[in-house]
UniProtKB/Swiss-Prot annotation:
Alphabetized InterPro entries for the sequence: KOW, Rib_uL2_dom2, Ribosomal_uL24, Ribosomal_uL24_KOW, Translation_prot_SH3-like_sf
SUPFAM superfamilies per the UniProt record, alphabetical: Translation proteins SH3-like domain (SSF50104)
Subunit text: Part of the 50S ribosomal subunit.
Family membership: Belongs to the universal ribosomal protein uL24 family.
Entry keyword set: Ribonucleoprotein, Ribosomal protein, RNA-binding, rRNA-binding
Entry's Gene Ontology molecular function annotations: rRNA binding; structural constituent of ribosome
Entry function: One of two assembly initiator proteins, it binds directly to the 5'-end of the 23S rRNA, where it nucleates assembly of the 50S subunit.
Gene Ontology terms describing biological process: translation
Name of the protein this chain belongs to: Large ribosomal subunit protein uL24
Protein's gene: rplX
Length: 105
């Protein structure tokens, strides 16, 4: 199955504690159906000091399930479903189903 969400996409959280938050996809984990989104699902972990790092509390983004995110429509920024179509060059591209706008540039 083709990937509907890719690294670099702007997505909106549609469920969870960060619902309504927009962010950029930093990493896609297809085996677990999860994505890492910038500034979303922040967690803190204790880091032991090392020779290069002083340690302490570190914050980073934890993965969220793909069902909790939706691609932002390129036209108005609202959550939208994704469809696929073949363009004039024979490439499979993604488009926003509500506006018909192409997601792939």
């Amino acid at each position: 199955m083709a990937a509907k969400i890719k690294k670099g996409d702007t997505v909106i959280m549609i469920a969870g504690k960060d619902k309504g938050t927009k962010g950029e996809v930093l990493k896609v984990i297809p085996d677990e159906s999860r994505v890492v989104v910038r500034g979303v699902n922040m967690v803190k972990r204790h880091q032991k000091p090392s020779q290069t790092d002083p340690g302490g509390l570190k914050s980073f983004e934890a993965p969220v399930h793909v069902s909790n995110v939706a691609i932002a429509d390129p036209r108005d920024g609202k959550a939208v479903r994704v469809g696929f179509k073949i363009d004039q060059h024979g490439r499979k591209t993604r488009f926003a189903k509500r506006s018909g706008e192409s997601i792939d540039v």
